[in-house]
Amino acid sequence: MAIISSHILDSVHGCSASGIRVQCQKILNRNGDHLVFEIEANEEGRIMEEVSFEDSGELFYQLIFFSDEYFRKKMAERYSGRQIVREIVIRLVLPDPETVSYTHLTLP
């Protein structure tokens, strides 16, 4: 078992991105992607999910942050629909969970 967690911030409004929808998908070769979990960030803009790994070795995942949907809800009356970024996708290679206890990824 491993835990995938994130603290998501809304830099437009200077607050936590509470309510943003996030998906975690396991990237499979030619068989498409497998949904691992889908969650909404809590009031502090945090997500935390336990994930079980059936395979060993490096595993390929992606986290998808639905930013357009988030801003559409947050700014309903002022939203122009002109977002050029609909989703933010972060692709990860997760090492064997038995060998790493904590990995921190900071994005600018």
Please give the residue ranges for each predicted region:
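Beta-strand-dominated extracellular/periplasmic modules and repeats
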Residues: 2-97
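Acidic, proline/serine/threonine- and glycine-rich low-complexity intrinsically disordered segments
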Residues: 99-101
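Conserved small/polar residues in nucleotide/adenosyl-binding loops
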Residues: 103-108
